[in-house]
């Protein structure tokens, strides 16, 4: 029984102790965005890209399936660009899109955590020339 309790505690606390794997890098003509989402929001608030640049987003959900709000899933969506990436609990999911025109776009998670109304569950993609 004690072993079961220890395993459950480790499983639930694992995201707290895992190293952060977020950041934005450039790989040739591809902007690589590794972004993490948890109940307290995204860990990146602003992304910059150039017109015509390919953007690869890897979204990691740090929450487990026991969260009552959204079941631990998180989303990275940009309506104007047709982007909708959903990461399952404690998982990573990726998607790629091309920044086709200049402007400032809002990315958000509308699955949990108050959705678009929560300022920590949104950010900006700025596409420049």
Regions found by a protein language model. Name each.
Residues 41-45, 79-82, 91-94:
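Short structured motifs
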Residues 54, 73-75, 104:
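Exposed beta-strand and adjacent loop surfaces of beta-rich binding modules
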Residues 60-89, 115-119:
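Histidine- and aromatic-enriched segments that form or immediately flank copper-ligand environments
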């Amino acid at each position: 029984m004690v072993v079961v309790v220890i395993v459950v505690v480790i499983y639930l606390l694992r995201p707290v102790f895992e190293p952060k794997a977020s950041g934005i890098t450039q790989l040739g003509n591809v902007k690589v965005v590794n972004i993490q989402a948890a109940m307290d929001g995204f860990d990146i608030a602003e992304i910059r890209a150039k017109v015509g640049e390919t953007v690869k987003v890897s979204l990691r959900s740090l929450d487990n399936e026991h969260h009552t709000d959204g079941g631990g899933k998180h989303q990275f969506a940009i309506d104007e660009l047709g982007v909708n990436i959903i990461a399952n609990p404690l998982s990573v999911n990726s998607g790629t899109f091309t920044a086709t025109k200049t402007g400032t776009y809002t990315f958000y998670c509308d699955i949990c955590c108050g959705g678009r109304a929560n300022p920590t569950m949104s950010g900006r993609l700025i596409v420049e020339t």
